[in-house]
Amino acid sequence: SFYNLTIDNALGVTLSSTQTIITNNLSINSGKIFKIEAAKNLTVTGVISNSGGNEGFILESNVAGTASLIHTTLNVPATVKRYISGNAEDWHFLASPVSNQVIASSSWVPAGTYGNGTGYDLYVFDEPTPCWVYQLNTSPTSTGENPNWPTVHPTANFVSGRGYLYSVQASNPTNQFAGNLNNGAVSYAVTKNSTLDPLLIGFNLIGNPYPSAIDWKASSGWTRSNLLDSGGGYDMWIWNPATNNYGVYNSLASTGTNGISNFI
């Protein structure tokens, strides 16, 4: 642990300890780089000052896991990498841990010709329809049962708290989000408007907006009173690409189904 930590090494600094706590401030000087290794955890209870921009603070990710940061400072620029495990063409749920990552021209958007080994697929779920809406569907015609992307996702950036469905033609790529880290309360409006399929009414795709895991079993830190009560708790569904099916975890349960844990 450290009281204060200042990154001023010309070669950069890499944090490799499993759990590190900085009890006061972290400062990253201009032109310097501070990396948190994959599967390592950093907590900063004071202020983070990053003069190195997105490239100066990097959270790594690989097959071992993803770096975690718990902090309280607003608008910290950083690059958060995400290792995508599984086979080519598997589907994954994801969300952005930064507030200002532009979707277009990022490593997450559809590119190339689907099926040639270079393409990506990106969708959002539209509960009122209900249907999956493709990022490349920018047709000027948008109907109630077949909305286009600009209708359901009018912003250019990933939306904090919104979940996305993602597939890639490569095996185990590492993509990244770059921008200001989300911090504090994040609100995302949910809907219960679907009339076309009663089995899907009220299902919304929500994502973890932070650069650290969140615990579905935690009794505080949430506002979930508008969710459907299930045995006194709340159910969440997560897609498991290894089994090609959803798993369910109830906030009062000790285990989930289909390999799903309580950590998002």
Q: Which residue ranges define each predicted feature?
A:
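N-terminal exported-region signature
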Residues: 1-17, 21-264
